[in-house]
Curated annotation (Swiss-Prot):
GO CC terms, sorted: cytoplasm
Species annotation: Methanoregula boonei (strain DSM 21154 / JCM 14090 / 6A8)
Family listed: Belongs to the MCH family.
Keyword field: Cytoplasm, Hydrolase, Methanogenesis, One-carbon metabolism
Protein encoded by which gene: mch
Entry protein name: Methenyltetrahydromethanopterin cyclohydrolase
Amino acid sequence: MLSVNELALEIFDNLADLAEEFNAVYHELDNGARIVDCGVSTRGGYAAGRAFTEICMGGLGEVNFRMGQIKEFPQPFIDVNTDFPSIACLGAQKAGWTVKVGNYFAMGSGPARALSLKPKHTYEVIDYEDDYDCAVICLESDHLPNAEVMNKIAEECHVDVANTCAVVAPTSSIVGSIQVSGRCVETAIYKLNELGFDTRKIASAIGTAPIPPVRGAKRAMGVTNDATIYHGQIQLTMNAPEIKDYLEKIPSSKSKGYGKPFNDIFKEAGYDFYKIDTSLFSPAEVIINELSDGSVYRVGAVNTDVTLKSFGLQ
């Protein structure tokens, strides 16, 4: 069976060995845990953002960058593809682990989740878990984890703390913008899973989303989510004729809150994340190629006006 931690470790080791070339900083704690800072006390960049995103996908996704346009505005875009969408996106990339130890808080994602089985139901549904002896976690945080945090992660993953690795970046950073936009495919897989569709039937997935500008900590969560909600474009290839029953519920435009920048929606919800319609967290546009009869379906559309408003370009 494929090990997402083993595959991610290869990318992590390269990032750690060549940290300076990635504008990253490598740390080894007294307990042996290894950490690469991709944006907390260093600027990071596109190379670090690619490595962070590919680690987050358990080494089962490929990331590339290009320049595109939104209306007349040139914008960087991230392109993501995987031939193991269920494992890469739900089994690794999904931000399904809230890491809270003492005063430390981070959103945890990446292959270490497949060892800790967080959340367990996800791994039951996709029928996958890892048993590798090293854990690699991605932490979205403004602070680096200390030895106590890494000990807790190791304990939850049932590995020695010296075999525990973390890449860390704040949402409000170059790497933060890249890795959140790099979840564009994951949002489609996540949405279908939430709707009850068996995502193991998805053979391949490819997607693109603009990489938003870094607009400060207060705007970071909103602007990074808007990149996919209003401009994420995904194509899924699958052998599942029943997909036609799910089509209309997939795109973000079916959400009650759709049509405003995320930060406006968040403000209207009294800054209570749990009051936001979760169906909003979906890509803007999805193309599905169903292999059993060769059907091709399209749902949703990009919303350039809201994207540009969120990005500060209107």
